[in-house]
Amino acid sequence: MITYFFLIVAILLEVAGTMLLPVTSSFSKPIPTIIMVLCYLGALFLLTVVVKTLPIAVVYATWSGLGVFSVAILGYFIFGQGLPWPVILGLFLIVSGVVLVNSFVEPKI
């Protein structure tokens, strides 16, 4: 169960780093840039821990799928980016796929 906790934290760090990309103003603002880099490094470090227990295909599908979903939702609320119905349908399919992929995985102990 700790493996999934690490995976969730890795996703949150990746999403935080991605949401900081526009704030860095093409890396011209040092503080947001440093925080963004630390978020990405933390996410990648945790992914290396998680793949010791879960198959990499499942880890990457979950990380990227939930990351895309989260960034799209946050982009809507924070940056006012649109979410037309085809995008909403696509996000629903991504989350459904993540749930399906994780339903049949057995962690290595």
Predicted region positions:
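Polytopic alpha-helical membrane proteins, predominantly small-molecule transporters/carriers
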Residues: 1-109
